[in-house]
Amino acid sequence: MVMTKKDTNISTQQPLWLQGYIDSPEKQNQLYKKTLKILIFSQIFGGAGLGAGITVGALLAQDMIGSENVAGIPTALFTFGSAVAALLIGASSQRFGRRAGLAGGFLIGGLGAIGVIIAALINSVALLFVSLLIYGAGMASNLQVRYAGTDLANEKQRATAASMALVSTTLGAVVGPNLVNTMGEFADSIGVPNLAGPFIMSGAAFIIAGIILLIFLRPDPLFVSTAIANAEKKDDKVQIGGSLKNPAIDKKGIMVGAVIMILAQLIMTAIMTMTPVHMGHHGHGLSEVGLVIGLHIAAMYLPSPLTGLLVDKFGRTTMAIASGATLLAAGLVAAIAPADSLSLLILALVLLGVGWNFGLLTGTALIIDSTHPSLRAKTQGTFDVLLALSGAAGGALSGMVVAHSSYTILSISGAVLSLLLIPVVIWYFRRIQEKA
């Protein structure tokens, strides 16, 4: 049954089917588990769409234009597209539910991938750039799915729920790039340019992910969680002047959660972006570069279930500090690693991935803790815009830093920046303890 806009209005009288969830913790738990399964299933396809397209975007643009100067444009375009889409998905999810917002993002991203294929067929650079921008919507949905898993989770389950969506993305993200050659051969066989082949997979994967959410994500977890929160009037009144019309939010908590995620994203993207270049300049082959980046990506996502458990068990403060300390270690190891030491570069990039994972899940949990369900999706979308832009800034600035100094200076800068996390987090949680 689809919830209408009327159903989402704050009211003391709820539809009977929705009242059943409000009155029954058992039904809430069943819906929570069902929602997680659907999100995990959709993310496997979403990850495949994400990984396959990113792998060859730069190569396709370079091939069509005939210049290496444009190799960075595709990344910038779909990163900017994902930032804009994150805002729109957050706003539409708040108004129409997670199902509409997330499914819409995946479906639009799939259309973007189809546009890339058409652009390659007719050799239209303008259409290629517009399509890559639209393709970013799939990336935005891919990242915002982690929030949907937390809508019905209690405070001790939120980081764990978010982590399940992240780790399921890994399955598709690993499979996608490994099918690049296969999809290229398939594209050749049907008369499509070889480098556009992976976008056939991306388009299909994003569209399948969207259809899964559109059909199966019912009832909408955000609508149900909002109704449950609105029914708990006594709890709302206890929170810092909260009311049903103006539900309480912890603005400082939101900002600290955002700072944790944004700094982790900025540091990770900056060092990750320049590591392949640094390795290439010192004689490492493509296979070695692929090994380092592959292990780094695995470290970004595979620890998610364990990280989620740690965040829920030991708290946001502990894991935020752990994120800062791990990113600090990553920057220092990268800075002191001899250029010909593959093992130390692997260690640095694995630490970088783990530190990012700690920061993303801790920041996500903190933002969820600090917002009322009736405002949550819009707030999450807003901060995912900043997350995407910080990644783009990290990638752009890293090249400038290395061009004017060195990879060592870049790594040390990342290490120093990571130290900012620790005092910010300690200040915030001391404030919480004083109020308690």
Swiss-Prot record:
<feature type="transmembrane region" description="Helical">
    <location>
        <begin position="197"/>
        <end position="217"/>
    </location>
</feature>
<dbReference type="InterPro" id="IPR036259">
    <property type="entry name" value="MFS_trans_sf"/>
</dbReference>
<feature type="transmembrane region" description="Helical">
    <location>
        <begin position="38"/>
        <end position="58"/>
    </location>
</feature>
<feature type="transmembrane region" description="Helical">
    <location>
        <begin position="409"/>
        <end position="429"/>
    </location>
</feature>
<feature type="transmembrane region" description="Helical">
    <location>
        <begin position="70"/>
        <end position="90"/>
    </location>
</feature>
<feature type="transmembrane region" description="Helical">
    <location>
        <begin position="160"/>
        <end position="180"/>
    </location>
</feature>
<feature type="transmembrane region" description="Helical">
    <location>
        <begin position="383"/>
        <end position="403"/>
    </location>
</feature>
<dbReference type="GO" id="GO:0022857">
    <property type="term" value="F:transmembrane transporter activity"/>
</dbReference>
<feature type="transmembrane region" description="Helical">
    <location>
        <begin position="102"/>
        <end position="122"/>
    </location>
</feature>
<keyword id="KW-1133">Transmembrane helix</keyword>
<dbReference type="Pfam" id="PF07690">
    <property type="entry name" value="MFS_1"/>
</dbReference>
<protein>
    <recommendedName>
        <fullName>Uncharacterized MFS-type transporter YddS</fullName>
    </recommendedName>
</protein>
<keyword id="KW-0813">Transport</keyword>
<keyword id="KW-0472">Membrane</keyword>
<comment type="similarity">
    <text>Belongs to the major facilitator superfamily.</text>
</comment>
<feature type="transmembrane region" description="Helical">
    <location>
        <begin position="291"/>
        <end position="311"/>
    </location>
</feature>
<feature type="transmembrane region" description="Helical">
    <location>
        <begin position="342"/>
        <end position="362"/>
    </location>
</feature>
<feature type="transmembrane region" description="Helical">
    <location>
        <begin position="125"/>
        <end position="145"/>
    </location>
</feature>
<keyword id="KW-1003">Cell membrane</keyword>
<feature type="transmembrane region" description="Helical">
    <location>
        <begin position="254"/>
        <end position="274"/>
    </location>
</feature>
<dbReference type="InterPro" id="IPR011701">
    <property type="entry name" value="MFS"/>
</dbReference>
<dbReference type="GO" id="GO:0005886">
    <property type="term" value="C:plasma membrane"/>
</dbReference>
<feature type="transmembrane region" description="Helical">
    <location>
        <begin position="319"/>
        <end position="339"/>
    </location>
</feature>
<dbReference type="InterPro" id="IPR020846">
    <property type="entry name" value="MFS_dom"/>
</dbReference>
<keyword id="KW-0812">Transmembrane</keyword>
